[in-house]
Regions:
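Class I S-adenosyl-L-methionine-dependent methyltransferase catalytic core
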Residues: 1-112
Length: 112
């Protein structure tokens, strides 16, 4: 898994070179969120207008042996997409989450 992240960054870079205004979505599993830090730091430097991070953990990310949640990196996300995702993530957490469930919605690059 971790070896795939540099390839994902390169693929997004290539996509943005060909289509700078294009929207791209990358799904990723979350076993332990701390393993994603380098990927997200690198992604935040991409030459995109906006970068939106949406994550749902159905349980705490304290075990690398199971899928604890998943995330989406949205490159050049549609306008006000965060306002659509916020209630959806809260609803999913309420219906699917176990004790310690959480969600995160964060602009790595906010709209200007």
């Amino acid at each position: 898994q971790n070896a795939e992240y540099p390839r994902i960054i390169e693929a997004i870079k290539e996509g943005l070179e060909r289509w700078p205004q294009g929207s791209f979505a990358v799904w990723y599993p979350i076993k332990q969120r701390r393993t994603l830090q380098h990927f997200l730091r690198t992604a935040s430097k991409l030459p995109a207008r906006t970068l939106l991070l949406a994550e749902l953990l159905i349980r705490p990310d304290d075990s690398p042996l199971r899928l604890n949640g998943s995330g989406m990196l949205l490159v050049n996300a549609p306008w006000q997409f965060d306002q659509v995702l916020s209630p959806a993530l809260a609803s999913l957490r309420a219906h699917l989450g176990e004790s310690g469930a959480s969600h995160r919605l964060e602009w790595l690059k906010a709209p200007a």
